[in-house]
Amino acid sequence: MKWPNDVLIGQHKVCGILVEQHSAKQGAALIIGVGLNVNNSLAGAPADVRQCATSVFDLTAETMDLNQLLIELIRQLEKTISQLQSRQMEMFAELNSVSCLTGRDVSVQVGDELIAGFCHGIDSDGCLLLDGDGRLNRLNAGTVVSWW
């Protein structure tokens, strides 16, 4: 997992997840968008794309039933969302254990500013915790430029 919304296999992005909260008189709702590279091959893509992305097909040489995949994805999302209240801290510990940034030096572009530091993980608000220049930065948005 690469904060804020990428799912990686090795160093290659296979999925992106965007979540937006919407509030109305009827209550709050989450709008969740998932983009998953499934049955496409990136073999013919430009070299810069192949360096940072992959697909399930490229990894397994097998196609998947997209309807079954969608059903399973929805089941897993429902399960995870229902566990958020009772297991929130546990789930963030799990998230940090699979984050490719935790325990590494990271550079994040936030607007015109480049913020670099040692990543302590992701807090319960979803902020990336970077320790740089003697202070802890809590980033709620940005683009990860590099990590090493």
Where on the chain are the PLM-derived regions?
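Conserved active-site carboxylates
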Residues: 6
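Conserved N-terminal catalytic core of the sugar/cofactor nucleotidyltransferase
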Residues: 1-2
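Long, positively charged amphipathic alpha-helical accessory segments at protein N-termini or as interdomain linkers
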Residues: 9-148
